[in-house]
Every structure is written in structure tokens, then in C-alpha cells.
């Protein structure tokens, strides 16, 4: 996980808005200089390796069957019927920054701090940056985020966050090192790709947006708190909440492990923040999310609690990886030594955002329940006096991954179309001063295309 000096959800992987958005202007097209112009100038500052390619289509449609994307790493994040744009020619740059860990085997590199940068020929002058959700890698949000923003004319960049997979907690020396690296790698990539855009297009981006899902949403929050100078705004899709005194994942998930082992009941989950009405999702999350998520993040921040589980690896088979540690049923974050809270404090959020932020969270999220997450973060922002920079939209019927809509189409709705509307709302807020709607719950429509449409107003 070592960075150079001076560099200030396995579970799902195992497991009215237009699609094209606003097209780039004729001026923006002229500025780009033609198909893959200035390719020879593109050099990612600080990269240890890069591979450039001139491609006819940078979207998942055009990249299907190539090694320029990875559908397996996108599994479960979008509903099956999701429509995405295509036909976006331009330059793709894959590579990595210097790092001492090698969890990421993409391209056979076995090297972390991998990134992907996409530079469309028809550029609108903007840049969108994201970090992988869960413990996935750099191509995870290609369908959910990259396709549409590229079609709108934005340059796009994504990082693997510097570590990936369910053994990510082994990265680093001190508790919290692996998660702290996520933030550093996102900052590093943002700074680098702004210079790459200048090489390709002749000037730096006029607007830079940070966004992400789950852990990528956490990164969005952290970046706008700690490096607002790099961004013009962000969209946070169900970002994970880390606070030193709680709530955080380690205060809500132990009850789920206890329940799975018969040591707790439904009322204990309600007390931990899980929503009434989300019970139909609990059996799946018990098998695919709760146990593994608790044990690997507890190992990251509190390795002394049970050194034998998960130990040096979360498991050697899917069954072992997803199995909970029995000791986590009794885990009490509040009773743990102060050193654990200090480890979490290294990556904790404060609510002190410095640029506009829109947060989305499903009311049926059964991994990061909003009552113990985004509801709390919205209050933190208000308490810091930054409420005018924030809008918070609860998505009725939304859950943590849109792929579950395909299993429960009568009880869930995908969040992605609401996210697309939120991104357009953010850019209108930042660039034209259009006031976004006040905080509210986006209700479930009685009819219509819920997979690809979600007006926020």
C-alpha cells in the first residue's frame, strides 16, 4: 500500500431522464482536435505503468469482449433492463501508480493502485472521478456511471482505491491503513487526470465532479470534506459512514451476525437501524453480505479482537469467505479499546463539506441502513453549518444494489435512474445556479419505466 513520498462488495461480485444526457457543444468538439488527437502527449503524472489505446467506443457496449472493461466486476450493481448509451469514441488509458501491494490481478499485473482514464473525442470540458464500490476494482462502475457521463461528454477516471478483494485488510501496517489509502489514491488520481485532460484537450477541466456508490460514496464525502479545492461538487450514492464514536459498520453489523447465529432477534436489527419492511431482503444479506463485511472491516480497524478469524485471509472458497466469525456476534464497538476508535478516526467523516453534495439512499438498504448512515451524515452536515451545500433524497423502495430489483420487481425499484437525475440536478446547481429540490423522499411510481426513469422533482 506504500505511496510515493510527497503524495500528500465481494458479495455482489459473487453474487424523467434521458440516457444520453446533454450532448457536447460544437465548440467542445472542435477543441478535442479529432479522433484520439494528441494521444502521443498523454502521460499520467506519477504512474509507474500506463497503456494507451485509441478506441471506437469507450462504453461497455463497445468494450464487450475486450480487456478494457470487466463485466464480472460490475455484477449485481445494475438492474438487468438498464439501458445505456454507446458510440463514444476516444482514448482509454489503463495503468497503475507505484504501490507495494498486489491484490488487483486485472491485466495480469498483480499490482494495486490501478486506474482507468477515458477521454472522449467529444469533450464537454468536464471530468468525473470515482472510486470502486465495496472491494471491487476500477471497472466496477463502467455501466452504472462511466457509460452515461462519457456520452454526455465528460472525461472519466476510476481507481481501485489501492487495494481490493476481501483480504484488503492485509494491506498496510497500522489498523486503518487500507481504508486511509482509498482516500489518498482518489486524491492522487484526481490531480493526475486533471493534467492528463490538459495534455489531451489543451486545457484543464472547467468542472470536476466526484461521485461513487457505497465505499465510492464514502470517498465522495471524504473528498468534499478534505479536498474541496479539487472538485465542483459530488453525488454520494449510499456512501458508507465512518465516525470514531459511531455509528459505523461496526456498530450496526454485529447484530446481524448475532441474529444469524440465533443470539439476537429482529428487534435487535431494528434497534441497530435496519428498516421495518426490509425483512424480505435479510436472508440474502445474511448469506452474501453481513458476515463477510463485519469480519473484514473489523479486521481492518480492530485486528486484535479475534486474530484467528478472519486471520491472514478471509477464506479460500466462497463459502469460507462469506461465513461470519462466531466471535462477531458479541462484538461491542463501544467497549473496545481507545486504539480502535483512533484507527477509525483516521478515516472518519465530519460533515464539513466544502462543495455542493447530493446524497441518495434507499429506504430498504439492508447492508448500510440509512437510519445509521445517511440520516446521520445529513445531520452532521447541518451541525457543521454546511446544510445549504447539501441535498438528501431518500429513494422509496431502493436497496443497496440494483441487481436485487430483478429478484423482487414488485417490492423494489432501482436507484440508478434516480442517480442519473441527481447528477443532472447537481450540474445544473453548480453550473447554472438552478436550485435543487429540497430534501424529500422520492416515492415509488404507480406505473412507468422504473428501471430507466426517476424524476426527482
Language-model features, listed with the residues they occupy:
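Secretory targeting and sorting signals
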Residues: 1-30
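C-terminal His-loop and adjacent cap/lid subdomain of alpha/beta-hydrolase
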Residues: 29-457
Amino acid at each position: 500500500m506504500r505511496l510515493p513520498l510527497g503524495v500528500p462488495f465481494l458479495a455482489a461480485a459473487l453474487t424523467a431522464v434521458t440516457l444520453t444526457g446533454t450532448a457536447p457543444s460544437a465548440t467542445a468538439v472542435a477543441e478535442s482536435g479529432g479522433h484520439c488527437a494528441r494521444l502521443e502527449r498523454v502521460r499520467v503524472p506519477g504512474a509507474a505503468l500506463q497503456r494507451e489505446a485509441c478506441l471506437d467506443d469507450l462504453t461497455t457496449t463497445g468494450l464487450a469482449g475486450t480487456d478494457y472493461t470487466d463485466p464480472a466486476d460490475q455484477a449485481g450493481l445494475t438492474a438487468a433492463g438498464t439501458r445505456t448509451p454507446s458510440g463514444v469514441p476516444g482514448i482509454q488509458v489503463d495503468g497503475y501508480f507505484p504501490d507495494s501491494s498486489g491484490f488487483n490481478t486485472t491485466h495480469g499485473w498483480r499490482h494495486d493502485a490501478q486506474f482507468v482514464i477515458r477521454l472522449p473525442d467529444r469533450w464537454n470540458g468536464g471530468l468525473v472521478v470515482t472510486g470502486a464500490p465495496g472491494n471491487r476494482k476500477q471497472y466496477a462502475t463502467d455501466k452504472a456511471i462511466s457509460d452515461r457521463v462519457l456520452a454526455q461528454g465528460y472525461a472519466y477516471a476510476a481507481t481501485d482505491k489501492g487495494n481490493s478483494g476481501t483480504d484488503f485488510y492485509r494491506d498496510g501496517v497500522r489498523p486503518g491503513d487500507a481504508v486511509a489509502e482509498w482516500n489518498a489514491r482518489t486524491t492522487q488520481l484526481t490531480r493526475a487526470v486533471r493534467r492528463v485532460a490538459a495534455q489531451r484537450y489543451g486545457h484543464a477541466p472547467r468542472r470536476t465532479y466526484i461521485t461513487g456508490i457505497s465505499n465510492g460514496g464514502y470517498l465522495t464525502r471524504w473528498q468534499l470534506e478534505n479536498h474541496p479545492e479539487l472538485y465542483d461538487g459530488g453525488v454520494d450514492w449510499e456512501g458508507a459512514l465512518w465516525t470514531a464514536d459511531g455509528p459505523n459498520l461496526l456498530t450496526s453489523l454485529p447484530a446481524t451476525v448475532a441474529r444469524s447465529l440465533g443470539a439476537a432477534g429482529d428487534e435487535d436489527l431494528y434497534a441497530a437501524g435496519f428498516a421495518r419492511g426490509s425483512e424480505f431482503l435479510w436472508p440474502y444479506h445474511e448469506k452474501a453480505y453481513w458476515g463477510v463485511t463485519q469480519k473484514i472491516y473489523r479486521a481492518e480497524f480492530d485486528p486484535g479482537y479475534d486474530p484467528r478469524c478472519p486471520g491472514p485471509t478471509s477464506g479460500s472458497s466462497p463459502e469460507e469467505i462469506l461465513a461470519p466469525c462466531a466471535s462477531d456476534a458479541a462484538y461491542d464497538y463501544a467497549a473496545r479499546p481507545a486504539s480502535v476508535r483512533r484507527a477509525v478516526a483516521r478515516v472518519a467523516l465530519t460533515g464539513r463539506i466544502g462543495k455542493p453534495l447530493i446524497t441518495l439512499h434507499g429506504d430498504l438498504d439492508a447492508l448500510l441502513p440509512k437510519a445509521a448512515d445517511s440520516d446521520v451524515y445529513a445531520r452532521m452536515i447541518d451541525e457543521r453549518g454546511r446544510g445549504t451545500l447539501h441535498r438528501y433524497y431518500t429513494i422509496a423502495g431502493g436497496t443497496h444494489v440494483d441487481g436485487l430489483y430483478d429478484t423482487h420487481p414488485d417490492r423494489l425499484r432501482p436507484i440508478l435512474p434516480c442517480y442519473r437525475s441527481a447528477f443532472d440536478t447537481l450540474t445544473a446547481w453548480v453550473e447554472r445556479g438552478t436550485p435543487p429540490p429540497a430534501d424529500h423522499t422520492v416515492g415509488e411510481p404507480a406505473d412507468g419505466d422504473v428501471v430507466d426513469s426517476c424524476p426527482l422533482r
